[in-house]
Design a protein with these regions (language model features):
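Structured alpha/beta or helical-core interaction and ligand-binding surfaces enriched in interleaved
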Residues: 1-158
């Protein structure tokens, strides 16, 4: 089951409370379930067709809204975010935004061409022999999502 969350154009009134609620939701996921957060108001154009015939047929663009998904994969929470056009994803991030995402701990997809072209991060980061997601890892995953939305995507709007 997917839990869909659509954030308002200005973001939550209380980011800390929203992050705590997200951590609780993450810990309650059953295997294979996910929570997906979208922000339609922060959509950016993505080129889906280049100009052709010497510009007589113009390039075509579609708006792509940013999304972040946290899904449970056995004993891990896999956090994924719409990929940057820089590595073949669908969302236009500026170079400073790409650098900020890496600084937050997001990982670019590997060199395997079949791999989905999204930013990702696993919690816990290593093989685990514990039950699904300790509270600290759920809080860390929620914090990554919160800081990404608040400090990178929403701050670009201002």
């Amino acid at each position: 089951m997917t839990y869909a969350v659509q954030l308002p154009s200005e973001g939550p009134d209380d980011w800390a409370a929203w992050s705590r609620d997200l951590a609780a939701r993450i810990r309650s996921l059953d295997d294979g379930e996910d929570v997906t957060i979208t922000v339609p108001e922060l959509a950016r154009p993505h080129q889906v067709r280049k100009a052709r015939a010497f510009g007589l047929i113009p390039a075509r663009y579609e708006d792509v809204e940013p999304w972040v998904r946290v899904r449970r994969d056995e004993h891990h929470a896999v956090v994924e975010m719409v990929g940057s056009e820089d590595f073949g994803g669908l969302f236009f991030f500026t170079e400073p935004e790409d650098a900020a995402l890496e600084a937050l701990g997001w990982r670019r997809p590997g060199p395997i061409s079949m791999e989905e072209r999204v930013w990702n991060r696993w919690y816990p980061d290593d093989v685990t022999d514990t039950a699904y997601l300790p509270k600290d890892d759920a809080l860390a995953a929620a914090d990554l999502v919160t800081r990404t939305l608040r400090d990178i995507l929403y701050s670009a709007q201002r």
